Amino acid sequence: MFDNLQRKFLNLIGIEIEEEDKPQESTKAKEENVKPKHETPKVVTIGKANQTEVTVYNLKLFDEVVKVCDALRENKIVVFNLEQVAEDHIQRIIDFVSGAVYVLDAKIHKVSKKIFVVVPRSIDLEVDEQLKEEFRTKGVFAWLK
């Protein structure tokens, strides 16, 4: 009959009101019928697991090196072939990719004389120790020492 504010006011001035015993079925029934509009899922997916993409590029011009770096930035494994690139551009391409590798904390590995693999930091790539030592001594990746 009285709402909460009126009841507090009457109690303040010293008048007490006794409540009538009413069945409280209606409030319980209302509570049971209330359903959340949208149930939240208990499991949240963070990302796609184990879906690593490998991209292969056969570069011909220096301007195409941007594709390699963009794919690396998208966390893709990149294999690129420099066999059709002019000799004076090969070192420029390797320098450009090496800069991207450094900035993105990735790794670069030489597969053959003009084929390279670049992997993002979230992926481990095993390289044979003998092959690794050969690359270090030849000076292609002297900064790996």
Swiss-Prot record:
It comes from the Bacteria. Keywords: Cell cycle, Cell division, Cytoplasm, Septation. InterPro entries: Cell_div_SepF, Cell_div_SepF/SepF-rel, SepF-like_sf. It is found in: Cytoplasm. One of its GO terms (cellular component) is cytoplasm. GO terms for biological process: division septum assembly; FtsZ-dependent cytokinesis. Residues 23-41 have a biased composition (Basic and acidic residues). Residues 21-41 are annotated as: Disordered. Cell division protein that is part of the divisome complex and is recruited early to the Z-ring. Probably stimulates Z-ring formation, perhaps through the cross-linking of FtsZ protofilaments. Its function overlaps with FtsA. Belongs to the SepF family. PANTHER family: CELL DIVISION PROTEIN SEPF (PTHR35798:SF1). Homodimer. Interacts with FtsZ. This is Cell division protein SepF. It comes from Caldicellulosiruptor saccharolyticus (strain ATCC 43494 / DSM 8903 / Tp8T 6331).
